């Protein structure tokens, strides 16, 4: 990774930044010179990721937060701005895709949890951070969606619907907060991270994708770096598929 996507002097707020693709993006942003504010539900996991960022010579802040809880998000944003004075890059990465037995057997509690984490929380965070970005020097918001929103299956219907709604929000907020704030979506397929260790071999092979494999972490962080950096200065309201050609 070179300094082509230089983020020196920038501050990135990454939800779900202590593991999986969020953790990979945290490290990539720091490697390009950004300071990072990391949030997830477990402060210990956030601190572990923050220690790695600091070892790279960058500053890191942490905050334990459940993005699904609207009331907690004001505190998260206040903590990030108190730590760094600004947020230049917001990555709405936190998400969950539990399987539902069937539409008729999906419990309301499960449905509400999925929608809150994958749609309602990002809506609130974009509102809070985007308005501050627009009042300041601008910035970049990156929403992490899912190939499931484009290729929905019955077992993930609530999740697919929530992510499809997130895709729509990307376009809406791009217009609301433009021209100073760019808002884009990355739509990932299956990626081999610490989360994938529980997958069986068939799932890892991803035979239904055109590339016949799951992605490597570095294959999504480059997309995130592009959207976070000035190299994407004429890109907003867009959805970037990084899914290996999933069918």
Write out the residue ranges for each language-model feature:
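Conserved glycine-rich cofactor-binding loop
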Residues: 18-19
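C-terminal substrate-recognition "lid" of short-chain dehydrogenase/reductases
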Residues: 84, 216-242
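Substrate-binding pocket helix/loop in short-chain dehydrogenase/reductase
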Residues: 101-103, 107-115, 205
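Alpha-helical segment proximal to the catalytic Tyr-Lys
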Residues: 131, 174-179, 233
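Residue(s) in the substrate-gating loop at a strand-loop-helix junction
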Residues: 146
């Amino acid at each position: 990774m070179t300094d082509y996507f230089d983020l020196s002097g920038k501050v990135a707020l990454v939800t779900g930044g202590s593991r999986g693709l969020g953790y990979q993006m945290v490290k990539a942003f720091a490697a390009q010179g950004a300071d990072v504010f990391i949030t997830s539900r477990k402060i210990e996991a956030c601190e572990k990721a923050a220690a790695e960022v600091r070892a790279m010579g960058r500053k890191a802040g942490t905050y334990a937060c459940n993005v699904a809880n609207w009331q907690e998000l004001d505190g998260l944003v206040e903590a990030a701005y108190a730590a760094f004075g600004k947020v230049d890059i917001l990555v709405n990465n936190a998400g969950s895709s539990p399987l539902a037995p069937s539409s008729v057997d999906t419990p309301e509690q499960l449905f509400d949890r999925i929608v809150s984490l994958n749609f309602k929380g990002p809506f609130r965070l974009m509102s809070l951070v985007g308005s501050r970005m627009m009042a300041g020097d601008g910035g970049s918001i990156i929403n992490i969606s899912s190939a499931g929103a484009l290729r929905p299956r019955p077992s993930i219907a609530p999740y697919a619907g929530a992510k499809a709604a997130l895709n729509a929000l990307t376009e809406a907020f791009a217009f609301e907060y433009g021209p100073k704030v760019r808002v884009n979506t990355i739509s990932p397929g299956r990626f081999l991270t610490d989360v994938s260790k529980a997958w069986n071999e068939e799932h890892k092979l991803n035979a239904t994708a055109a590339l016949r494999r799951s992605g490597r972490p570095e294959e999504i962080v480059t997309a995130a770096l592009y959207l976070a950096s000035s190299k994407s200065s004429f890109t907003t309201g867009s959805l970037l598929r990084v899914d290996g050609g999933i069918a």
